[in-house]
Amino acid sequence: MKQLWLVMFLSVALIGCSDESTPEKLSAADISAGKVVADRECKGCHGLDGKGTAPGIPNLAGQRGRYIMAALKEYKEGTRTHAALRQVAANMSDDETRQVATFYASLRPIQAPKPDQFSAYENGKKVAATCTHCHGENGNSKTPGTPSLAGQQPVYFVNATHEYLTGERKSAPMDPMLRRMNRLDIESAALYFASQMPAERSAPPTGNAAEGEPRTAVCGGCHGSHGVSTDSATPTLAAQDPEYLTQAIKAYRTTRKHPLMSRLVAELSDQEIDNIVAFYTTQKSKPAESGETLLKEITTKCDRCHAGERDNPALAIPIIAGQDKDYLTLALRSYRDGKRGNSMMHNMSLPYGDSIIESLASYYANQPVR
């Protein structure tokens, strides 16, 4: 999730950074003139009090003027894609842009309605409770042929689940449960299981781990040293159920479609597969994520720029505490999906899925305005 997710994030986004260096000068003349511009161009969505008139529309009251100016400039230049706002920005002169930004910056900040705090980890814990009958407590399977999910990489988990849903992978017992899960639930379960400690396993009755280790040299290029993956989209093999791992490897001879894996597996005998499985089964694994503390880790990074008291006059950075949750969600998704041009925010939000974005948006919407 540090690469999936998971945390990230004005109208389609009040989040982002720009190098606009206009100082915050709140002159009375600009405030008065800006109110006239706001009455003409902005009040239908943002009100004259700076409060968004519907969910998904950001509050502008108390927002940094230099950020509002930078956002309007980006709409005017087409860097941000919102048809109505591009037209609004085009209707404003440079003076009017400064004036309306000054007007909204002069208003007392408005606290958006506080939503319920969403926790991807806690939601995943609830979803995972339906999986324990087969996959074991905390995702450590004790059923031969059923994979352990503890410590598994989250993007791989999401992708594998999608393959079951589309029929690319066959598993009749999984089907009814999976079809009750939405994308948010699947991502949440992925985070929860990725954060669990994998149990150690004893050697399986077949295969020789010592003979299998040399054959894993090529495998390690993708699956990591000793089968502990460092790539969120590539599965960890260490401490996996041996019967399941054997079946999964051999499936590349028949039903599974992956050119590289199919070619590599075609070169292996059954005994060599048993040896490889014996090696990976007995390796120690570890959690791929830090689910219970992940949100705190991400928000600590966000606050380096976005905390209200950390205003950098050289950057146009928005205040996000107390902002509308739906707007924050839209903004983060837009950065993640490449629909906004800010490279800094794009790089920050790229790894995060909907469950982490939902957690972040509800977290900041619940913070007091400053």
Regions found by a protein language model. Give the residues of each.
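Extended non-catalytic domains of envelope/secretory-pathway proteins
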Residues: 135, 153-154, 179, 184-188, ...
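Sec-dependent signal peptide recognition
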Residues: 2-8
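Gly/Gly-Pro-rich "capping" loops immediately C-terminal to redox-active cysteine motifs
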Residues: 35, 51-77, 86-88, 139-165, ...
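Sequence/structural segment immediately N-terminal to covalent heme-attachment motifs in c-type
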Residues: 27-48, 116-140, 152-153, 204-228, ...
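C-terminal capping alpha-helices of c-type cytochrome domains
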Residues: 90-112, 179-201, 266-288, 335, ...
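C-terminal motif of bacterial Sec signal peptides marking the signal peptidase cleavage site
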Residues: 14-16
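Hydrophobic, ordered structural segments
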Residues: 66, 74-83, 88-95, 104-115, ...
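Bacterial signal peptide processing site
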Residues: 18-20
